[in-house]
From Swiss-Prot:
Protein name per its UniProtKB record: ATP synthase subunit e, mitochondrial
One function term, GO molecular function aspect: proton transmembrane transporter activity
Residue intervals passing through the bilayer: 7-23
The encoding gene: TIM11
Bilayer topology: Single-pass membrane protein
Biological role stated in the UniProt entry: Mitochondrial membrane ATP synthase (F(1)F(0) ATP synthase or Complex V) produces ATP from ADP in the presence of a proton gradient across the membrane which is generated by electron transport complexes of the respiratory chain. F-type ATP synthases consist of two structural domains, F(1) - containing the extramembraneous catalytic core, and F(0) - containing the membrane proton channel, linked together by a central stalk and a peripheral stalk.
Residue positions where N-acetylserine is found in the record: S2
InterPro entries, A to Z: ATP_synth_F0_esu_mt (IPR008386)
Family statement: Belongs to the ATPase e subunit family.
Amino acid sequence: MSATLNVLRWSALGAGVVYGFVHNRTLYSQAEKKVADAKFKKQEKLIEQAKAEWARLHPAPVASTGVVTDISDDKFDIEAYLNHAFPEKA
C-alpha cells in the first residue's frame, strides 16, 4: 500500500474517533440537562403543593368589619380598604 493511502486511512480513523468523542459528550450533556430540568420541575411542583397546603391550613384573617386587608387576596378591594383605613371625618 502506498503511504498516501495509509495516511488517509489513519486520518479518517482519527477523525472518526474525535467525532465520536465529541458526539458522545454532546449526548451526555443533553441527558444530564434533561435530568436536571426534571429534578427542578419536581421541586417546583413540591413547592407549589406546599404553598397550597400552607394556604389551606392558614387562611388569611378577615377583619371584623368585613374588609380584606391582605393585598394578595383575590377579594381585596382597594377602595374598601382605604375607606376603612382612613375614614372620612365630617
